């Protein structure tokens, strides 16, 4: 499953790392239970809670045609104490 797009590194997400909370963008069609099951299976950790919100798409325009970028969902995953996951870094070329 490739539901997790990439990890998010903002001031808030870096601050939340101290509380054992990890932030990442996921596909908008993914559900909380799918992401929770995938994180627990892939990383071998226990998830306590998950918070999510949808990010607004940005407006784009090409000539007379107006559109918007794809919407993403941002998940904040809280792990049990003692567990951690490595940062999800997308390799960009």
From Swiss-Prot:
InterPro entries: Nucleotide-bd_a/b_plait_sf, Ribosomal_uL23-like, Ribosomal_uL23/eL15/eS24_sf, Ribosomal_uL23_CS. GO terms for biological process: translation. GO terms for cellular component: chloroplast; ribonucleoprotein complex; ribosome. Transmembrane segments: none annotated. It comes from the Eukaryota. One of its GO terms (molecular function) is structural constituent of ribosome. Gene3D superfamilies: 3.30.70.330. The keyword 4Fe-4S does not apply. It is found in: Plastid, Chloroplast. Keywords: Chloroplast, Plastid, Ribonucleoprotein, Ribosomal protein, RNA-binding, rRNA-binding. Pfam families: Ribosomal_L23. Binds to 23S rRNA. HAMAP family: Ribosomal_uL23_B (MF_01369_B). Part of the 50S ribosomal subunit. Belongs to the universal ribosomal protein uL23 family. This is Large ribosomal subunit protein uL23cz/uL23cy.
